[in-house]
Swiss-Prot record:
The keyword Metal-binding applies. It comes from the Bacteria. Mg(2+) binds at residue 268. GO terms for cellular component: cytoplasm. Binds 2 magnesium ions per tetramer. This is Phenylalanine--tRNA ligase alpha subunit.
Amino acid sequence: MSQDLDQIVADAQAAFAAANDNATLENEKARFLGKTGALTELLKGLGKLDPETRKSEGARINQVKQQVEAALQARRQALADALMNARLAAEAIDVTLPGRAVARGSLHPVMRTWERVEQIFGSIGFDVADGPEIETDWMNFTALNNPDNHPARSMQDTFYVDGRDSEDKLLLLRTHTSPMQVRYARMHVEKYAGKAMPPIKVICPGRTYRVDSDATHSPMFNQVEGLWIGEDVSFADLKGVYTDFLRKFFERDDIQVRFRPSYFPFTEPSAEIDMAFGNGKWLEISGSGQVHPNVLRNMGLDPERYIGFAFGSGLERLTMLRYGINDLRLFFEGDVRFLRQFA
């Protein structure tokens, strides 16, 4: 019996070692530990032995069974380790290879223009103001000398918002950034009340909204407006400042500009600013003028003492001219092929 048990252990160890996959290993397990396996048959034969022999042989068989199970578990672990090593080898990463490039975004072309405008005017002492996009009817129209019957106040041109402010005034999406000029000027006057007040020099870039949409107009567009108010500011200063801005923005010294008489309710006199392009063509690029006395009063200033100028330009228009873009809608479509050109 002892020799038979030793042979079973040796045969089991050899069979398990020869198994190259789990299926083969399970088949070999059945040969030795299954219901009809060699050890199971020996255990069944213990009933034929006398009690003393049965006890000693039973202990010996159980010891051999533990050896066989240990050999089985060792082979299972070896196969699992081999499988894991093969998988790791197949999925190995060569850390010496260059990594994947990080996808980097870039500024939208209109934002590039926005930052460029701020930098140019900042270099000549202009502050940059910000303000709410939802404005009151008074701040957007009345404070800027727009009469009650002005067509811009109609729902065909302006997006009105449900509700009213704390003073029961109508709310709307601002149609220009001029309300920021009024807010800034009023804060400036309040800040220097009873003191010597320095000139008001500010630009107001921001989003504006109008009921309009075609190849050259959008219901939402970006605008920058400038304001310079002091005791001796003239129309000549307006011409010098804006012409110098265009030369720096387009990086050209041969810029030709003309001021064409026009009408705006918030300036008097008013002028459209045109810029010369090839073949003797002129293109409107900005509206401008001296700040109307009524607007100065609404800013808290004495029009008998203070005078100044204002201008307003579309940032999309400036961007289109700088980069030669023909359709305004390209700025809002989010086409990466278009935007990547400015990265």
